[in-house]
Structure formats: structure tokens, C-alpha cells
Amino acid sequence: CTNLELFKLKSNSDGALRQNKPLTVGYVGSIGVWYLFEEALDYYKLIQEVVPDAQLHIINKGGHTYINECLNNSGIDKGSVLLETRDHLDVAHAMQSMDVGIFMIKPLYSKIASMPTKLGEFLGCGVPCICNNGIGDMSDIINDRGVGVVLDSFDTDEKKESIMYLLKLIKDPLIKNRCRETALKYFSLEDGVNSYNNIYKSLDEKL
């Protein structure tokens, strides 16, 4: 579940400031054992081949040394990357200014039934997502609702094809509202609490 009172759409007045700004790809959170951070960087590099002035905004706590090593090895111009740490409230504000969120997760058995919190946070802010297949219901939600790109493999040709779709998706005037509606449908904290309460009540009645 996601706090959709915090992770919400940017106001129209703030949104007007986004005009004429470069495409911003956002990476928020861990780069640890479950995440394929280098695959995310590779995808960003391919985006830059199509949109040379695209920016990468990374928000992370505790992994900056490893991130900088990966950036150096990738050949990405660090002038196009903003790497920083923010508190929880500021993270939500920063995500509102991103055009697309990216995260790649190792499709391990332990992740089959999981759902990344950051998906709900990005969608709550009206930001479509790029991710890989094999993680919970994430692929079905993104594909069925048209709120991002799901990679079935890390093949370069598939990535390039998905980028063309992604760039069209970002220009869709309805995409932000569609992302927000998807977050409300699948990630509402209030609905999640109510669901758990109903489960506990039903268990109590059986005891």
C-alpha cells in the first residue's frame, strides 16, 4: 500500500514550470541485492540515443559510492545525472517532477508474490514506469492499464522498441491521470487497511 495523500499529482501551477524542461528519468530507492541497477542505467543510455538531453535523477540513501562506480563504468556523462539523498516528504515532491520512473528487479522465486512499493508511489504521482516482467502482478497492472513499459527480456532490440512506445506514452495527455487512477485502484493505503480489518473481523467471527 502507498500513502496517496503524500504521493500525489503535482498542482497545475507547478506543472506549468515543467514546460521546455528535458525528459527526466527517475530512479528512487535501493540499488541493493534485489535490484538490477546496471540494467536500469543501460536502459537510460538507450533513451539518450533517442533523446540526447534526457536527464537521470537518482534518489538514494547509502549507495552513492556504488552508484558512482556504475556510472563511471557505464560511460554515462555525469553532467546528465543528479544523484542525491532526500527525506521522505521531499522524495514525493521530487517524484512529481519526473517524467518516467525506472526500476529493474531480479525475477527470483521470492519476488513472485511481491509488489514494489515504489510502483504505487510513482503511479500516485502520475509517473509511468519502466520495469521487468516476473514480479508479482506488476506486469499485468502496467500492461492492462497502459501506465508504463514491461520488459520481457533485457535484449537490446526489445529495449529500443519499448523506448519508442514509452516516448509516445509520455506525450499522452491522459497518462498522468491514468497513472493516478491506477494507484488509487491498486495501492490505496486506506483500502488496504480496510481490507486487513475485514480479514481480521472474519477470523474473529470464526473463533
Sequence positions of predicted segments:
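A charged, aromatic-enriched C-terminal amphipathic alpha-helix characteristic of glycosyltransferases
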Residues: 154-157, 170-202
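Conserved donor-binding loops in enzymes that form glycosidic bonds
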Residues: 1, 27-33, 60-61, 84-85, ...
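Nucleotide-activated donor-binding/catalytic signature segment of Leloir-type glycosyltransferases, i.e.
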Residues: 22, 60, 65-95, 100
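Nucleotide-sugar donor-binding and catalytic loop/hinge architecture
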Residues: 8-24, 48-49
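Nucleotide-sugar-dependent
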Residues: 35, 84-85, 89-94, 101-120, ...
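Short beta-strand->alpha-helix junction loop in the catalytic core
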Residues: 1-8
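Conserved donor-binding/catalytic core segment of Leloir-type glycosyltransferases
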Residues: 17-44, 57
